[in-house]
Curated annotation (Swiss-Prot):
Gene3D superfamilies xrefs: HesB-like domain
Keywords per UniProt: Iron, Iron-sulfur, Metal-binding
Keyword Methyltransferase in record: no
Signal peptide feature range: none
Protein name as catalogued: Iron-sulfur cluster insertion protein ErpA
Gene behind this protein: erpA
Annotated organism of origin: Klebsiella pneumoniae (strain 342)
Record carries keyword Iron-sulfur: yes
Annotated cofactor note: Binds 1 iron-sulfur cluster per subunit.
Family in the record: Belongs to the HesB/IscA family.
A GO biological-process term: iron-sulfur cluster assembly
Amino acid sequence: MSDDVALPLEFTEAAANKVKHLIADEDNPNLKLRVYITGGGCSGFQYGFTFDDQVNEGDMTIEKQGVGLVVDPMSLQYLVGGAVDYTEGLEGSRFIVTNPNAKSTCGCGSSFSV
């Protein structure tokens, strides 16, 4: 997708940069970071991340720095207006989701309710 089109989900430079490095380590340029939502966690829904070399029908792919972020349509409805980022800090390094649709989140930030 073009950078000048309003996207429903932001893929930050930090996240794209980390994905680029991780894909280079795997030596598979077809890999993309997939973000998804599943039921569970202490708040009802939880975020998941995996590397995937398949893009399914209906998936949205957001390209940045030559790498892709893939989201299935069911998960995207909960993520509209949000951002996938990468952070490094005292608690470790990880991909995170900033989600304006979440009414509450758990302390670790990996689960939420709407």
